[in-house]
Amino acid sequence: MRKLWKRAAALVVSAALAGAMLPSAFSKEATDAVEAKLTTMTLQEKVGQLFWVRPETLDFSLNPEKKTLTQTMRQNLEQYPVGGIAVFKKNIQDENQLSSLIADFQSASKIPMIVAVDEEGGAVARLANHEAFSLPKYTSARDIGKTGDPEQARQMGRTVGGYLRFYGFNLDFAPVADVD
């Protein structure tokens, strides 16, 4: 019986590896598009893609609560391009301002930016816990995980992902694997 399990496991691993080696229908097209874009980028732009910053760091006045993309920030973004921004509660005033901030950053960047937020649920929810937003609030992902109900996790993911996408975010720093 043990020998049978080993063979079955080897077969599953072999099939998975073989499947991973098959080219996808999009891989050549996507690779070509990326390669074409890279040939037009300067070294500074390529290195800038490695960095994600808070919006206010692009305004050297050190005002920690920037809620709009200023002309200075726009100029600094052009001179010091970055790959993305991480938005925090202090950068958020209301729904219209948030959508405008994200759209303005995207339009000011030559390359589509990663726009991230920390929307884990529970105490860490920059939008759901903000007084200007009427969004569903979830307990922490840890609490949902403790229920053992995958449908609750799926529902949280769909809901949070949906409203983040609506506002222009394309990365959520969640779920996380926090341990006590």
Regions inferred by a protein language model and the residue ranges of each:
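Bacterial N-terminal signal peptides
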Residues: 12-20, 118
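Residues within well-ordered alpha-helices
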Residues: 34, 72-73, 160
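Bacterial N-terminal signal peptides that target proteins for export
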Residues: 1-12
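N-terminal glycine-rich anion-binding loop in soluble enzyme alpha/beta folds
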Residues: 31, 35, 44-66
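Enzymes and membrane/adaptor proteins characterized by extended Gly/Ser/Thr/Asp/Glu-rich
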Residues: 56-66, 76-180
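Sec-dependent signal peptide cleavage junction
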Residues: 19-36
